[in-house]
């Protein structure tokens, strides 16, 4: 299931952060889950789409 949300915060040095989804809950994100080339980071307020894994 693909969800969308906004990056609540992301610590590039530690490599993790949280994304806030529409219902107000937070989803943990680790840098290893970020797709794309180059440095893997997210900006606060950035709109993202993602899949949740158990």
From Swiss-Prot:
The Gene Ontology terms for molecular function here are: DNA binding
Q: Which domain of life is it from?
A: Bacteria
Q: Where in the cell is it found?
A: Cytoplasm
Residues of the CSD domain:
5-54
Under SUPFAM superfamilies, the record lists:
Nucleic acid-binding proteins
> What UniProt keywords apply to this chain's record, in alphabetical order?
Activator, Cytoplasm, DNA-binding, Transcription, Transcription regulation
Instruction: Give the main localization category.
Output: cytoplasm
- Cellular component terms per the entry's GO annotation: cytoplasm
- PANTHER family attached here? COLD SHOCK DOMAIN PROTEIN 2 (PTHR46565), COLD SHOCK DOMAIN-CONTAINING PROTEIN 4 (PTHR46565:SF20)
Per UniProt, subunit arrangement is: Homodimer.
Functionally, this protein is described as follows: Can bind to ATTGG and CCAAT motifs (Y-box motifs) of single-stranded oligonucleotides.
Recorded protein name is Cold shock-like protein CspE
Q: Which organism is it from?
A: Bacillus cereus
State which gene encodes it. Answer: cspE
């Amino acid at each position: 299931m693909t969800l969308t949300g906004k990056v609540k915060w992301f610590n590039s040095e530690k490599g993790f952060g949280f994304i806030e989804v529409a219902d107000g809950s937070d989803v943990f994100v680790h840098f290893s889950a970020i797709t794309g080339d180059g440095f893997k980071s997210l900006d606060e307020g950035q709109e993202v789409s993602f899949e949740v894994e158990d």
